[in-house]
């Protein structure tokens, strides 16, 4: 399957087991993988388009990974829309979809015994920001990504800048474990109102969505202040988030941080160079994350 034969609205091959995807792999040539949890949206379409630029064939994995959800998180209600996802993949000319069950990905674990399986430790980078507020999250992410790499054997994998810390942690895993995969970052896709596309946006009511726009507004305000240094960036963003905390419904911030894009350590006021301004917040029962890259 070559780039020239890829066409929109073709039906991708659906594989569900390790044996099926591995039997197909020799036919795929240079392969780019887009790992997803399904509920595909315009952001995922952008990732698929980016993947197409780097390989002959494109694979999309669809797997809601229980290992990256905490005990009080939204694993059970996370959107599962396989028929819709398959239509999106067909429209985008995806060659193969890998949609395993939990039993395929974690054959010796069920329910509570998930905690007994061997996982990939994310190191110190995976214990700050998202790792602090969602303990075990990056263990789950890196473990499933590593398993997908081993099963599918892609040459390239595409991740969104919208999940900037995840992108950085995956890059570190690939480097430290000498994995033969090139990681490509795709820019964040936003809806016309500025909200970063996310599968969790479907949880938001109209009023909650209006409040949630404070996240992107805060980030853009911070980016506009970048020439004045880190303190000005954070002050500009905090001003908007403080106002949003008094809105109806309110925005409740988990963190706002200005970090080094490689290590995700917070930068000091004398820092100059590339950085990421990242935010996580709750609007109603929905937790959203967003970020913008900037140069100080």
From Swiss-Prot:
The active site is at residue 44. The keyword Ligase applies. GO terms for molecular function: ATP binding; pantoate-beta-alanine ligase activity. Its main location: cytoplasm. ATP binds at residues 37-44, 160-163, 189, 197-200. It catalyses: (R)-pantoate + beta-alanine + ATP = (R)-pantothenate + AMP + diphosphate + H(+). It is found in: Cytoplasm. Catalyzes the condensation of pantoate with beta-alanine in an ATP-dependent reaction via a pantoyl-adenylate intermediate. PANTHER family: CYTIDYLATE KINASE/PANTOATE-BETA-ALANINE LIGASE, PANTOATE--BETA-ALANINE LIGASE. This is Pantothenate synthetase. It comes from Thermobifida fusca (strain YX). The gene is panC.
């Amino acid at each position: 399957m070559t780039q020239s034969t890829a066409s929109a609205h073709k039906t991708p091959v659906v594989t569900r087991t390790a044996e099926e995807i591995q039997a197909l792999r020799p036919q795929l040539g240079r392969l780019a993988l887009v790992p997803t949890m399904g509920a595909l949206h315009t952001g995922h379409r952008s990732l698929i388009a980016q993947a197409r630029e780097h390989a002959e064939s494109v694979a999309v994995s669809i797997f809601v990974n229980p290992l990256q959800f905490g005990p009080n998180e939204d694993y059970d209600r996370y959107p599962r829309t396989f028929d819709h996802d398959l239509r999106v993949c067909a429209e985008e000319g995806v060659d193969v979809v890998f949609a395993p069950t939990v039993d395929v990905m974690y054959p010796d674990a069920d329910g509570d015994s998930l905690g007994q399986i061997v996982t990939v430790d994310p190191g110190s980078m995976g214990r700050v920001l998202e790792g602090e507020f969602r303990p075990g999250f990056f263990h789950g992410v890196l473990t499933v990504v590593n398993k997908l790499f081993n099963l599918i054997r892609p040459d390239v994998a595409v991740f969104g800048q919208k999940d900037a810390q995840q992108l950085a942690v995956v890059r570190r895993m690939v480097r430290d474990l000498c994995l033969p995969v090139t990681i490509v970052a795709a820019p964040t896709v936003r809806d016309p109102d500025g909200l970063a596309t996310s599968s969790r946006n479907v949880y938001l009511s109209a009023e909650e969505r209006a409040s949630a726009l404070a996240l992107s507004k805060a980030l853009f305000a911070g980016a506009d202040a970048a020439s004045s240094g880190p303190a000005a960036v954070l002050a500009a963003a905090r001003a908007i988030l403080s106002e949003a905390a008094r809105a109806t419904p309110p925005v409740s911030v988990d963190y706002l941080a200005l970090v080094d894009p490689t290590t995700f350590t917070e930068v000091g006021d004398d820092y100059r160079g590339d950085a990421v301004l990242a935010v996580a917040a709750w609007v109603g029962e929905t937790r959203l994350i967003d970020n913008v890259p900037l140069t100080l």
